Amino acid sequence: MAVYTVLDKRELAQIVEDYGLVKLVNATGIAAGSVNTNYLLETPRGRHLVRIDEVKSELEVKRELDLVLFLRKHGFPCPQPITDRKGRHYREHDQKCLSVYRYYDGHPVRPARISAGLLENIGRVLADLHTIGKSYKKGIDNRFSYERIADLYLEVRSKLPSYFKKIVRTLDDEVEYLQNYLEGKLPKGIIHGDLFHDNIIVKGEKVVAILDFEAACRGKFIFDLATAVNALCFDGENYDLKRFESLITGYESLRALSLAEWDAFPNELRFSALRFTITRLRDFFLNPVDEQARVNKDFREFYERLRILRRERDGGMEGLLMAMATGYDYRKYQKVKALEKKGSK
């Protein structure tokens, strides 16, 4: 249950009054999520979400709010924080930051029912985020750079049980490999960093809202796209080539990948899988969390993806590599043609 800070009916009614929502009709703690406390409020002015940040500092909360307000100003479908009667987007509650957001009707993406049309729309929305975010000038520290993940792994590694020897060997090898083969000089800007099924609210094939900007930072666009591929194009056993092609088609309808990005794509997929394997191992072995959250955030989901991406087991990697090679060759062809056209003038 993701309700770590309990609010009684009186406290919830006071929040409703302070945010000008008339009166509290009903309130429900939300079980989804594993980091923050969330309540769904029903009021005469619609449904709203109360969020209490359990781990973020006030500065981190302010940075996240600044970003979502910027994105909303530019028409991006993301959470809409509302202000209280004093004009504040967040307030203090029990030494934590509390904020209230408009609630979006719709439902999270259902992995088993994800269609080609929906994947194209998700790809397009992600490219829109990257395009809009290029003009965001405020810095947001990247908590998931290679250096930080490598440091985190050293911390986690010392806590892993002895029967994890095989997993440790794989992770040791992957951390060393990526240190030498991750490309740093790639297009960067604001990225979401955590584009999973439950962070995408949809109605039919329309993307209503992208949620959860807690991991958003300035980073490589191709890493963000790789994370979306790992989250949305894996069917539980294999990477689905048709899903991959649909997601990329939607993305490139707004923003074409560069040659360097196509070239870096396989390693960014591996780094994304490594990142979530390590952070979930941390959550399991280092952080005290709800038992249900342990089940929902099983590190093995991404460890198995990593094994496929390393070609240690079958799972559709060959198809992805072929598609990425084709994308690289086509982008190269486009570049050559553009140069020829320019030279003929």
Predicted regions and their residues:
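An alpha-helical support segment within catalytic cores of ATP-dependent transferases
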Residues: L7-D18, K137-G139, A150-G193
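All-alpha amphipathic helical-bundle segments outside canonical DNA-binding/catalytic cores
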Residues: G117, L259-L269
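Terminal low-complexity/disordered tails
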Residues: F144-Y146
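Conserved NTP-binding catalytic cores of kinases and kinase-like/nucleotidyltransferase enzymes
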Residues: M1-R85, K203-K206, M324-K345
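ATP-binding pocket architecture of kinase catalytic cores
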Residues: T43-Y136
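ATP/Mg2+ or Mg2+-diphosphate-binding catalytic cores
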Residues: E155, F276-K345
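Active-site acidic catalytic loop and adjacent metal/ATP-binding pocket
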Residues: S34-P44, L49-V50, P81-I82, E176-F223, ...
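Active-site activation/catalytic loop segments of kinase-like enzymes and analogous catalytic loops
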Residues: I222-A256, S272-P288
